[in-house]
């Protein structure tokens, strides 16, 4: 009987540890990532509303992944050119970011508020991985998390070529912004 009680207590302690480990992670599979480039021809603007993201509130680890073909454009022809000629979505189907929120301890995930964050990591796109640093914001409201960031990407850094015909009419960098509404992972 004593061993049964000890085993039960051990099981409860282990369960509590697992529970708290899961309670540290926030997740979404409907994150919004937008890119924008102002051009003399016309603005290039697309949004992907299917980005997945996990943030570990204890360690600051963050991972984001999205399928390139999920970017939606106002014009179907732009979407076709983007996937076939620029990012070659069949060859390089996804983009990922893996990194850390370096000042995660300044974010109180149990208290409503807006917290500025510093993010470092590696962005992989078009088969190329580059180190990256950016700033962002985490807003905590009623137990939900809204993480946002905005940064510039040089197309040449990721070997994304601009055809000579339109080279002078398209910017060499694009603005990328992300809005991620995350919820605590269920236990």
Task: Report the location of each language-model feature.
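Bacterial Sec-dependent N-terminal signal peptides
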Residues: 1-26
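Low-complexity, acidic/polar, glycine-enriched regions of mature
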Residues: 22-187
